[in-house]
């Protein structure tokens, strides 16, 4: 059963996005309270009205804040999700976030990458907030500080959207490069991708850390060797393994790595004992054969 490694930087980035989402919700709640400030009179009892009378809508040429919100998204919102009169939108949003968390856990257990799951989840949360908490039209009595806050929030949202589009474009370019000729080596486009590649390499090496591989010896025989005998830190092994042609590309795609080739490469570069035991020419041929077999499959 494969293990899932989540990078601390990815978790911190996710927590930062959640904090931004909470701040957005607080601002939305404040706008909703401001828009409902005029609803301080006695409520109209409609229990005794005929059933069809309750469905009537009054058209006013002077739209209020609440009426503007209703015109912007009421029709589609009622078709997709009918909210009861007594339900609090904040509670519904909290319930939605709980369901999102459960879905993230399920997707991670199924083997999907955390960064891919999180980017999709952020887009879904933004869409939910946009549909269910639309921005009300401006009022003449609106406070200037609220207007300034709204403009700053809009600029931040636009900037974040532009950054996401830019990163997606870079990721697509990297994928096209990776799918080109085998001689072209995939390179990480940002820190998150690079960390995910390192995590995949470390995961596969750690699973076979004590597994012995056969290597040609100088005495025309063979000898057994494993990663544990290198006496190296796993991070240093991963750093050296990334220099093996084709390994970062295979790790990015989630494919199986040629671990014997990686071990031979790291051993030649860092272990004097391995250098004394192995026959270099035969090892080079074995490593090249392993690379060709894994990159062509």
Swiss-Prot record:
UniProt region (Disordered), positions on chain: 131-188
Domain of life: Viruses
Biased composition (Polar residues): 158-170
Residue ranges, compositional bias (Basic and acidic residues): 140-157
GO BP: any one term: symbiont-mediated suppression of host JAK-STAT cascade via inhibition of STAT2 activity
Keyword annotations of the record: Chaperone, Cytoplasmic inwards viral transport, Host cytoplasm, Host nucleus, Host-virus interaction, Inhibition of host innate immune response by virus, Inhibition of host interferon signaling pathway by virus, Inhibition of host STAT1 by virus, Inhibition of host STAT2 by virus, Inhibition of host TBK1 by virus, Inhibition of host TLR pathway by virus, Interferon antiviral system evasion, Microtubular inwards viral transport, Phosphoprotein, Viral immunoevasion, Viral RNA replication, Virion, Virus entry into host cell
GO cellular-component term (any): virion component
Residues recorded with modification Phosphoserine: 64, 210, 271
PTM annotation, UniProt: Phosphorylated by host PKC and by an unknown kinase.
Sequence motif Nuclear localization signal, residues: 211-214
Molecular functions (GO terms): RNA-directed RNA polymerase activity
Region (DYNLL1 and DYNLL2 binding): 138-172
Annotated motif Nuclear export signal, positions: 49-58
Entries under CDD domains matching the protein: RABV_P-protein-C_like
Known function: Non catalytic polymerase cofactor and regulatory protein that plays a role in viral transcription and replication. Stabilizes the RNA polymerase L to the N-RNA template and binds the soluble protein N, preventing it from encapsidating non-genomic RNA. Also inhibits host IFN-alpha and IFN-beta signaling by binding and retaining phosphorylated STAT1 in the cytoplasm or by inhibiting the DNA binding of STAT1 in the nucleus. Might be involved, through interaction with host dynein, in intracellular microtubule-dependent virus transport of incoming virus from the synapse toward the cell body.
Family: Belongs to the lyssavirus protein P family.
Protein name: Phosphoprotein
Organism field: Rabies virus (strain India)
Name of the encoding gene: P
């Amino acid at each position: 059963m494969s293990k899932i490694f989540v990078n601390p930087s990815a978790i911190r980035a996710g927590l930062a996005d959640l904090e931004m989402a909470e701040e957005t919700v607080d601002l939305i709640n404040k706008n909703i309270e401001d828009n409902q400030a005029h609803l301080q009179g006695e409520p109209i009892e409609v229990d005794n009205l005929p059933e069809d009378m309750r469905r009537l809508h009054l058209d006013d040429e002077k739209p209020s804040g609440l009426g503007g919100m209703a015109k912007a998204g009421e029709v589609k919102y009622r078709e997709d999700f009918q909210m009861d009169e007594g339900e609090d939108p904040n509670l519904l949003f909290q319930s939605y976030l709980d369901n999102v968390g459960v879905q993230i856990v399920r997707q991670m257990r199924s083997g999907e990458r955390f960064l891919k799951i999180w980017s999709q989840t952020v887009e879904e949360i933004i869409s939910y907030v946009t549909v269910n908490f639309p921005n009300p039209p401006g009022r003449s009595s609106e406070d200037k500080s609220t207007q300034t806050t709204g403009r700053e929030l809009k600029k931040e949202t636009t900037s974040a959207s532009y950054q996401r589009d830019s990163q997606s474009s870079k990721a697509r370019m990297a994928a096209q490069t990776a799918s080109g000729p085998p001689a072209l080596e995939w390179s990480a486009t940002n820190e998150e991708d690079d960390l995910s590649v390192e995590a995949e390499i470390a995961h596969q090496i750690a699973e076979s850390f004590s597994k012995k591989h056969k290597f040609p010896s100088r005495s025309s025989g063979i000898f057994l060797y494993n990663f544990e005998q290198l006496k190296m830190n796993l991070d240093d092994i991963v750093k050296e393994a990334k220099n093996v042609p084709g390994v970062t590309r295979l790790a990015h795609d989630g494919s199986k790595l040629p671990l014997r080739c990686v071990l031979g490469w790291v051993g030649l570069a860092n272990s004097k004992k391995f250098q004394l035991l192995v026959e270099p020419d035969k090892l080079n041929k074995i490593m090249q054969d392993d690379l060709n077999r894994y990159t062509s499959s």
